[in-house]
């Protein structure tokens, strides 16, 4: 059966097209339309299967009820989990999420922002990369709510939600030191983004505070997006040539690759060799022995991001930007 048009619904309900439009766009109570009429029209809408054209609706109301989510890599477990949480929370508030990955390519990131603009999204949730400052500044100048998360852009005054990467990393290295470890390695990636640089800074600070010399040869910086086999070759060389007694992997996918290398080389995790992964993963709990991991507060990050962007969307005046840092915790296994 062909679904009804907005005109058909108005005729069937015995009301004007304008009244039906107000009800569909959530403005019925602002226009003092009675509850009886609202329920009558809503019943006809449900029974007819009527679905408003989203683009036409956004042109009429100025709102699309769509939020754009831009992340580094949606296949990464951290981003996929947080995207799902954001999507669920947004849906409960009447918003849909469309998302895509930058893969840390600045041109792709700029193209995504342009694409989301053409989709008339109401706001943006972005895990940014350097070089996007002007684009994000322009979004805010256009009165579009923008929430940055996971990594910040220090030169940009914008809303930001993230975990305390420095403190979580410091505590991880400190836990190694308290176990008597002296040759502590950091396996990280070579991209200049806030959360990665903070982990390296915290690593160096913890060593210095406990009078352990920083040795550059104990830090492996893996190229972002390089083939896993090449990464594993680099890790194997590091583990075999240095007398390492502990290693912090700066991401969970690096840790998973590292566990494969340790298995291949026969290096045992235990009293003589300890491992911590940044960002927890199901693999670490299932592994024998269990792998300690830094757990970011994904639920709190998602909830805070949604609360911030919804408050921005509903406010008739510009709100002050907020920087919210949430604690991460070390899960010892």
Which residues does each PLM region occupy?
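N-terminal helix-turn-helix DNA-binding module of bacterial transcription factors
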Residues: 1-62
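N-terminal helix-turn-helix/winged-helix DNA-binding helices
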Residues: 2-5, 45-78, 82-84, 93, ...
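Short beta-strand segments enriched in small/hydrophobic residues
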Residues: 17-22, 59-73, 183-190
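Hinge/beta->alpha junction and helix N-cap segments in small-molecule ligand-binding domains
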Residues: 71-80, 100-108, 161-171, 187-234, ...
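Central regulatory/effector-binding core of bacterial HTH transcription factors
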Residues: 88-133
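Flexible loop/hinge segments that line or gate small-molecule binding clefts
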Residues: 126-171, 178, 191, 253, ...
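Short acidic capping loops at alpha-helix termini that bridge into adjacent secondary structure
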Residues: 183, 214-218, 268-275
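Flexible loop/turn connectors
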Residues: 232-333
């Amino acid at each position: 059966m062909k679904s009804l048009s907005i005109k058909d619904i108005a005729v069937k309900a015995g009301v004007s097209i304008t009244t039906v439009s107000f009800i569909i766009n959530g403005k019925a109570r602002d226009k003092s339309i009675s509850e009886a009429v609202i329920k009558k029209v809503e019943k006809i809408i449900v029974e007819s299967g009527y679905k408003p054209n989203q683009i036409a609706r956004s042109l009429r109301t100025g709102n699309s009820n769509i939020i754009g989510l831009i992340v580094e890599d949606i296949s990464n477990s951290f981003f996929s989990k947080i995207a799902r949480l954001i999507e669920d929370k947004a849906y409960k508030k009447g918003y849909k999420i469309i998302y895509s990955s930058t893969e840390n390519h600045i041109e792709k990131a700029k193209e995504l922002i342009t694409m989301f603009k053409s989709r008339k999204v109401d706001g943006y949730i972005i895990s940014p990369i350097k070089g996007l400052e002007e684009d994000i500044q322009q979004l805010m100048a256009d009165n579009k709510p923008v929430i940055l998360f996971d990594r910040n852009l220090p030169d940009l005054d914008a809303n930001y939600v993230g975990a305390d990467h420095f403190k979580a990393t410091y505590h991880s290295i400190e836990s190694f030191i308290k176990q008597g470890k002296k040759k502590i390695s950091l396996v990280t990636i070579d991209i200049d983004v806030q959360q990665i640089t903070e982990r390296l800074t915290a690593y160096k600070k913890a060593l210095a505070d406990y009078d352990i010399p920083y040795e550059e040869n104990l830090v492996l910086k893996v190229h972002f997006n390089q083939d896993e086999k090449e990464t594993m070759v680099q890790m194997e060389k590091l583990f075999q040539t240095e007398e390492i007694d502990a290693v912090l992997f700066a991401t969970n996918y690096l840790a998973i690759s590292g566990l494969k290398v340790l298995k291949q080389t026969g290096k045992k995790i235990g009293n003589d060799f300890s491992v911590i992964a940044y960002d927890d993963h199901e693999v670490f709990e299932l592994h024998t022995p269990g792998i300690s991991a830094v757990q970011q507060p994904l639920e709190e990050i998602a909830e805070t991001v949604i609360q911030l962007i919804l408050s921005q969307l509903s406010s008739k005046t510009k709100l002050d930007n907020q920087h919210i840092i949430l604690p991460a915790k070390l899960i010892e296994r």
